[in-house]
């Protein structure tokens, strides 16, 4: 009986010693789930970057993502409506998300972003916050009433600014 109790105790200790390793794996990455990426189509796209298919984007996997293209295509099951989770991709330099049904987009944490292409959405809010590296911005055919681009270091007038 004493041996059996000691055996159970050892098994419990060994099992508990494995728990911190499992917890740290999610602490050093982002789980690909409905909480972090609520939009199913965006979550599906994000899963393509999970090279080891463990359901978690590691810090290394995240830092290797420079470009995301998720343009709408109704023939492939609909449009993206929410890009919540885009803030995790801090090395992102190019985001293409045109022809969807996105109404709010916050890329203020994507400070490496140099190119943002999101025409033909339903954008009413676009937060460019700290995007001083942004060089190309396309937001035509949206519902934006105003757009603060004061964070940009250089802006050039569009051709329509010269129209008679």
Label every PLM stretch briefly.
Residues 4-22:
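Sec-dependent N-terminal signal peptides of Gram-positive bacterial secreted proteins and lipoproteins
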């Amino acid at each position: 009986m004493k041996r059996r109790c000691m055996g159970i105790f050892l098994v419990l200790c060994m099992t508990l010693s494995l728990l911190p390793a499992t917890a740290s794996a999610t602490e050093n990455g982002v789980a690909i789930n409905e909480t972090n990426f609520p939009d199913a189509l965006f979550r599906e796209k994000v899963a393509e970057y999970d090279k080891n298919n463990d359901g978690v984007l590691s810090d290394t996997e995240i830092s290797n993502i420079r470009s995301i293209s998720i343009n709408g295509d109704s023939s492939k099951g609909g449009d993206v409506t929410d890009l919540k989770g885009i803030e995790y991709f801090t090395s992102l330099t190019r985001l293409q998300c045109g022809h969807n049904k996105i109404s709010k987009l916050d890329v203020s944490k994507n400070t490496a972003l140099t190119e943002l292409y999101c025409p033909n959405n339903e954008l009413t809010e676009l937060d460019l916050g700290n995007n001083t590296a942004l060089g190309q911005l396309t937001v035509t055919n949206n519902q934006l009433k105003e757009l603060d681009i004061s964070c940009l270091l250089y802006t050039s007038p569009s051709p329509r600014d010269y129209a008679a």
